[in-house]
């Protein structure tokens, strides 16, 4: 994947979290929610890019990846699953939530769990951003550029 996209993504994280980049001795817990199943070919590249980007910035992170599997579940089931993701993230002491694609974005913000309102949240690869929803949440940073997955696979 394009390293420049990951660098820009990480810069947006740093703009959202002043001082986040200066505390390299701390280990941050990151919840990475992907919209589809782990068998989707590009998901390993996304995880690797996220890890590499934090590593290049000198940050120590524990990344927990959860898969929403949105092609399988109904919307109501997705919201229940997302609440479980949030519950586990809360138990781990998660510091940042990152999601990829529309399903994870929308489900996180509408599942009814307050974690998405309490932590910094970064979304990327959104095809249909909901401007009013994004604008109403000061803790949300969205990169609406599309990652050209078809060029890489």
Spans of model-derived segments:
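Bacterial N-terminal signal peptides
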Residues: 8-18
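Short hydrophobic alpha-helices and adjacent helix-cap/hinge residues
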Residues: 2-5, 20-153
């Amino acid at each position: 994947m394009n390293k420049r996209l990951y660098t820009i993504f990480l810069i947006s994280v740093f703009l959202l979290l002043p001082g986040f980049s200066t505390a390299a001795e701390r280990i941050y817990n990151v919840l990475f929610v992907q919209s589809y199943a782990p068998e989707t070919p590009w998901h390993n590249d996304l995880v690797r890019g996220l890890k590499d980007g934090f590593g290049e910035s000198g940050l120590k992170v524990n990344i927990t990846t959860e898969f929403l599997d949105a092609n399988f579940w109904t919307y109501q089931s997705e919201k229940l699953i997302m609440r479980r993701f949030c519950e586990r993230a809360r138990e781990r002491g998660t510091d940042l939530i990152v999601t990829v694609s529309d399903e994870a974005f929308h489900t996180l913000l509408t599942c009814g769990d307050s974690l998405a309102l309490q932590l910094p949240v970064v979304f990327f690869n959104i095809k249909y951003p909901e401007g009013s929803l994004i604008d109403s949440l000061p803790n949300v940073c969205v990169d609406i550029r599309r990652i050209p997955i078809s060029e890489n696979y």
